[in-house]
Amino acid sequence: MKNLFLFMAITLVGLGGCSEKRSQPLAIDNSLTQEEIAAGVLSPEVMWKMGRVGLASLSPDASRLLYTVTWYNMQENRGVTAIYVRDAASGEVAQLTDFSSNNSDPKWNADGSKIYFLSDRSGSSQIWEMAADGQNPRQLS
């Protein structure tokens, strides 16, 4: 019986170390090396440095566009998705979420004052809301 409890305790401690909860933002370096520039070839390594644009959502008044970009860190073998907003009139782009968690599927509320999105910042993918400028994120589910 003692062996069973010991085995269970070791297993639980081991599984706890497998948690992937991130507190530090993922470092993204998408700058090309001199060799990549000189070669002028769109190699797989160069392509992995490019962000992948994902879902988009137009604001109710059509003045702003929300969209996601997934960036990759090849050294850590993982990626992260961030939410951006672009002003239609000026073309100005602002990053609304950082690289410490994956944030996806942004949607505007009816009056364009809030954004609803999915995020794994709490450890699992949940529904969140934030102000239209990216401030005051709050978990809803």
Can you annotate each of these PLM segments?
Residues 55, 105-107:
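Conserved beta-strand position repeated once per blade in WD40 beta-propeller domains
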Residues 62-66, 96, 112-116:
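Hydrophobic beta-strand positions that form the internal "hydrophobic ladder"
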Residues 14-17:
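C-terminal motif of bacterial Sec signal peptides marking the signal peptidase cleavage site
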Residues 25, 69-82, 97-103, 118-128, ...:
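A flexible loop/linker signature enriched in serine peptidases of the S9 family
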Residues 19-21:
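Bacterial signal peptide processing site
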Residues 30-53:
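A short helix->beta-strand "capping" segment at the edge of beta-propeller domains
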Residues 87-91, 131-135:
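Short loop/turn segments that connect beta-strands within beta-propeller blades
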